[in-house]
């Protein structure tokens, strides 16, 4: 296999790996380090992906930083390094797990989960920056929400009416509305009632041992909207995980379980975590695998597939590939 690389503005761009048949193999999109829990965002014509960073030869999710990558053509990726880390939060000490960044009013808000020294459990934090690649700083000097091992994997969504929502949780699903400042919660935190109809199975405490449910929400929610419908994607099925989803007519439900998107398959990782984005007229599904050499369940890498929604707005089945996506547009290396 032949790896091609290009330097643009003194920044490493990962281009493509060529397979024996001459087919371009784009997955994983970053091949110099492990990148997990991808969260895409489009700003000013550029697609950014915010990821976690699994440590080399790790035996658990001992993660210390988050990373940012960007592209204008979906195959050449600029590495912006790590503009946010555990040390950015004085109240935290470990487990820089899944996160998502969004833009509002010229500011970029990066919602993260990490281990809190205050509660000795997991917590949701928020950092803010003036650029999509930072620098970022702790926006409030304390957790946005603290106090439970459930509090992981935040996803944030700003609706057409300007209201912003935060979802998170494993194995329960929590939600809250954000104030306009994006760094405080509006009202009380809620917990979704999981049912067979909404998520394939009841709440975790109501599940009956040895009963085979349609599905089970696990973690990693991703909330987005398309043509008036709301989609909540998530890792499901326990260990190992696949990706499933529910749909609703409103940002807070009621939700209806719709089935699997990425069925269980040989990704080399017992977890999965997805993000969905439209860019340059195409729809993209980001996820992670353990397929980078030396990788596995604690060494995961971001991958991406292009897809088209079904005519009725539902998701097609999306399978993990080595080939990934084709370029969109052209790249000027100067």
Identify the function of each model-found stretch:
Residues 1-26:
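Bacterial Sec-dependent N-terminal signal peptides
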Residues 23-334:
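Carbohydrate-active catalytic/glycan-binding domains of CAZyme proteins
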């Amino acid at each position: 296999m032949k790896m091609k690389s290009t330097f643009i503005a003194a920044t490493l761009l990962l281009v493509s790996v060529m397979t024996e048949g001459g087919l371009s193999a784009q997955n994983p999109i970053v091949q110099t380090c492990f990148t997990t829990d991808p969260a895409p965002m489009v700003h000013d014509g550029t697609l950014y992906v915010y990821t976690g960073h699994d440590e080399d030869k790790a035996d658990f999710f001992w993660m210390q930083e988050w990373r940012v990558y960007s592209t204008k053509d979906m195959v050449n990726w600029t590495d912006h390094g790590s503009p946010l880390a555990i040390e950015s939060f004085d109240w935290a000490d470990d487990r820089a797990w899944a996160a998502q960044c969004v833009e509002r009013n010229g500011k970029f808000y990066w919602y993260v989960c990490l281990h809190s020294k205050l509660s000795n459990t997991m917590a949701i934090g928020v950092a803010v920056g003036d650029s999509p690649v930072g620098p970022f700083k702790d926006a409030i000097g304390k957790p946005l929400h603290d106090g439970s091992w459930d509090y992981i994997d935040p996803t944030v969504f700003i609706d057409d009416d300007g209201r912003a929502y935060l979802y998170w949780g494993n194995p329960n699903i929590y939600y809250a509305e954000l104030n306009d400042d994006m760094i405080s919660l509006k009202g009380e935190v809620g917990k979704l009632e999981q049912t067979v109809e909404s998520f394939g199975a009841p709440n975790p405490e109501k599940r009956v041992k040895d009963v085979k449910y349609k599905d089970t929400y696990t973690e990693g929610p991703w909330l987005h909207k398309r043509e008036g419908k709301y989609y909540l994607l998530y890792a499901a099925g326990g260990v190992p995980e696949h990706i499933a989803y529910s749909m609703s007519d409103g940002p807070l439900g009621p939700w209806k379980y719709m089935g699997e998107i990425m069925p269980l398959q040989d990704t080399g990782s017992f977890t999965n975590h997805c993000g969905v984005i439209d860019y340059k007229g195409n729809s993209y599904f980001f996820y992670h695998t353990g397929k980078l050499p030396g990788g596995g369940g604690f060494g995961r890498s971001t991958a991406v597939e292009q897809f088209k929604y079904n005519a009725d707005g539902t998701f097609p089945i999306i399978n993990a590939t080595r080939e990934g996506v084709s370029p969109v547009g052209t790249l000027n290396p100067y």
